[in-house]
């Protein structure tokens, strides 16, 4: 099983319910294919550096998960088919990136407490 991180941007005109529904759809897809969710973060509505689909902002979300590599093809196809997704990027994490992500999560947890 490989370790991956996906960041995706949802259309800013969506309601809070639609955003939660969309995030849940992708999370359910991963878990149904045997993925283990390591971390899930909602970064909220953020202004983008440049316009995408004539929009200046979007709802950012991050998933960190472990899954067999062949599942990613179907996962990314789901992103491409969903009109609510403006952009997405999936990267494979090496051991250094995994340790950095763990430190970042610990730091976020400490600031929230």
From Swiss-Prot:
One of its GO terms (cellular component) is ribonucleoprotein complex. Keywords: Ribonucleoprotein, Ribosomal protein, RNA-binding, rRNA-binding. GO terms for molecular function: small ribosomal subunit rRNA binding; structural constituent of ribosome. GO terms for biological process: translation. Pfam families: Ribosomal_S6. It comes from the Bacteria. Binds together with bS18 to 16S ribosomal RNA. Belongs to the bacterial ribosomal protein bS6 family. This is Small ribosomal subunit protein bS6. The lineage of its organism: Bacteria, Pseudomonadati, Bacteroidota, Flavobacteriia, Flavobacteriales.
